[in-house]
């Protein structure tokens, strides 16, 4: 009985619909015809209740697994979605969904009461802000280069906010480039004109004439990096001081931290600044000019620089692997590289590209698979110009595209491998398995529809011998004397 079950399972593995060597999926597609607000979906998010939210170019859609609800700006005095062009979504710890739009305006949606709310507490929710940061206490900081910033607090069921602006005499400059929190919980505001530390409801200038690019916290020390590679150090009770300059005023593109090393990517390559010793060296393995850094959902780094090549860096082990995801002849036609990366619950890394489809990298097998849209037949993605990717809590992979809707991929063959005795490109059912049997020596004998008899090692990895017969083999048995 066990042998028959084994044979049926092998037959299922071999003849399920395949899209790649080791990842087999089923896909469903949704467009405006199914209720999505717009076919160009720029962001996907699953909230704490399980709803899937889709930010599109013409409204916000909420999907419950069966139907859609669409939100768009409304007239009148009722608070509604502030703009129809959505670019980012995130839920905070109080159950509010923060919605960033292309108009540099934010909306805030109460997921418990199903309504939009005034997050400022004073009717100023139409102020321009481009970026958002949430501190460890749950306060939301909004800012824009030119309009200062706002600290939003939700407490006892009410929103209150504090505006930091030069005109209010509580901010040295309105031209904010970042707001960051250090390991001690202190808030730092970087601008094109210097660095300020938030003390109460006022930002106090700690360094002038510093075109702020990034802050890095190391214990009680705080380092500030300028847009031209100057690194300053601020210690408790001491004035800020310059500790080094990277190159000759090279333009900084991005940074990442690996243990005690702060890696800075500039126009002439990368530099390594050791946060403990303050020593600077050149990075030989990651000497990537104009490198841009993305961090995936596991905290690992992905670097790209408009060459179509992407470098993966494991944040804990520092392991580096590169992938050529977009050919050189294609990347020149793409003005802005757009990659989104999700490391899923199966240890498969999914990478969406803008212009060359979808990739899946299996960490266990070190195999990279490529999924493309095919206008001449069925495809699991509907465009090669992808805009976002997300894994839901059931393990489904959501892939959105530009102008062609969204796909949900379900992985079918978790823990299974496909075995092709014959050439896997054959379409004449030559790989139909007629017989499979484990012999007393643990070797596996397998017969195919073409009369082929294959002898595999005990793990079905290696063919040790093969021969063909004039008819199909349906059974095999070894006698007491060892004869077959």
Predicted regions located by residue number:
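Carboxylate-rich, polar loop motifs that coordinate divalent cations or form catalytic acidic clusters
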Residues: 1-484
């Amino acid at each position: 009985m066990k042998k028959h079950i084994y044979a049926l399972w092998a037959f299922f593995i071999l003849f399920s619909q395949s899209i790649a060597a080791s990842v087999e999926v089923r896909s469903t597609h949704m467009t405006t015809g199914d209720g999505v607000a717009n076919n160009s979906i720029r962001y996907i998010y699953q909230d704490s209740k399980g709803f899937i939210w889709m930010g599109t170019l013409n409204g916000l859609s909420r999907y419950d697994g069966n139907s859609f609800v669409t939100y768009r700006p409304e007239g009148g005095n009722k608070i509604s979605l502030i703009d129809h062009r959505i670019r980012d979504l995130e839920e905070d710890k109080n159950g509010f969904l923060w919605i960033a739009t292309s108009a540099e305006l934010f909306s805030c949606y109460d997921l418990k009461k199903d309504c939009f709310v005034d997050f400022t507490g004073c009717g100023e929710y139409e102020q321009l802000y481009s970026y958002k940061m949430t501190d460890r206490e749950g306060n939301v900081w909004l800012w824009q280069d030119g309009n200062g910033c706002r600290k939003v607090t939700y407490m006892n069921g009410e929103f209150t906010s504090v505006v930091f602006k030069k005109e209010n005499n509580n901010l040295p400059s309105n031209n904010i480039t970042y707001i960051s929190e250090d390991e001690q919980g202190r808030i730092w505001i970087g601008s094109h004109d210097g660095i300020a530390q938030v003390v109460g409801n006022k930002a106090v200038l700690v360094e002038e004439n510093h075109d702020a690019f990034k802050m890095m916290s190391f214990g009680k020390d705080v380092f500030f990096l300028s847009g031209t590679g100057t690194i300053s150090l601020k210690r408790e009770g001491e004035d800020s001081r310059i500790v080094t300059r990277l190159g000759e005023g090279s333009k900084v593109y991005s940074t990442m931290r690996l243990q005690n090393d702060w890696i800075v990517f500039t126009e002439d390559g990368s530099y390594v600044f050791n946060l403990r010793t303050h020593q600077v060296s050149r990075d030989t393995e990651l000497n990537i000019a104009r490198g841009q850094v993305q961090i995936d959902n596991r905290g690992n780094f992905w670097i790209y620089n408009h060459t179509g090549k992407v470098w993966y860096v494991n944040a804990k082990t520092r392991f580096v692997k590169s992938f050529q995801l977009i050919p050189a002849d294609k990347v020149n036609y793409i003005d802005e590289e757009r990659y989104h990366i999700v490391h899923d619950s199966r240890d498969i890394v999914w990478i969406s590209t803008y212009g060359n489809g979808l990739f899946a990298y299996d960490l266990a097998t070190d195999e990279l698979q490529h999924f493309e849209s095919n206008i001449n037949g069925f495809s699991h993605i509907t465009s090669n110009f992808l805009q976002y990717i997300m894994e839901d809590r059931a393990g489904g992979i959501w892939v959105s595209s530009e102008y062609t809707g969204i796909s949900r991929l379900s992985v079918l063959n978790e823990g299974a491998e496909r075995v092709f005795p014959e050439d896997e490109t054959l379409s004449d059912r030559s790989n139909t398995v007629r017989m499979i049997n484990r012999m007393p020596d643990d070797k596996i004998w397998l017969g195919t529809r073409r009369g082929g008899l294959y002898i595999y090692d005990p793990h079905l990895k290696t063919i040790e011998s093969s021969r063909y017969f004039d008819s199909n083999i349906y059974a095999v048995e070894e006698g007491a004397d060892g004869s077959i």
